[in-house]
Amino acid sequence: MKSAARILAVGLVLAALAIPQSGMAGGNGTAAFEQLKSLVGHWETDKSNMNKATLDLELTSGGTAVLEKFRMVEDGKPVEMITLYYLDGDQIKLTHYCMAGNQPTMHGTYAPESKTLKFELESITNLKSADTGHMHHATYTFIDNDHFKTTWTFRKEQKDAFTEDVTYVRAK
């Protein structure tokens, strides 16, 4: 009888651990997705920290995804990348289609009190080796309705190589 009670107790503990708890990382994905949806429109860099670039965000796939299109010219050549933001259950995620030729997928944690959305690498496709360069982290800071900042961290040779901080202004 004691072993049956012990098995039942262990089963209840395991079941409790399997149930998502409110307030855990990623449990606020819906709020983060709503914040990203508020960015739909045309944006330009504030030009204080990089070449002029544009960012277009659009709601797609029946409202289930936000598609971001980044465009700029560097050394006379066009630079274009896209990032797709979406929910997986109540977890906000992104997949970034990078000029580096790989596609990192990241999961995010939203902190409404600081207006920040932080993404961490979850998986990546087309990565030739662990030393190959790729985007590894991203942070969005929502300043107001017409301004937001992104910070992307590029990792190469298994260490952070550089960070790009860009502030965007909504084009009117």
Where are these regions (language model features)?
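Polar low-complexity intrinsically disordered regions
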Residues: 1, 21-23
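Bacterial N-terminal signal peptides that target proteins for export
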Residues: 1-9
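Bacterial N-terminal signal peptides
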Residues: 9-19
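Hydrophobic small-molecule pocket/channel-lining residues, especially in calycin-type beta-barrels
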Residues: 23-172
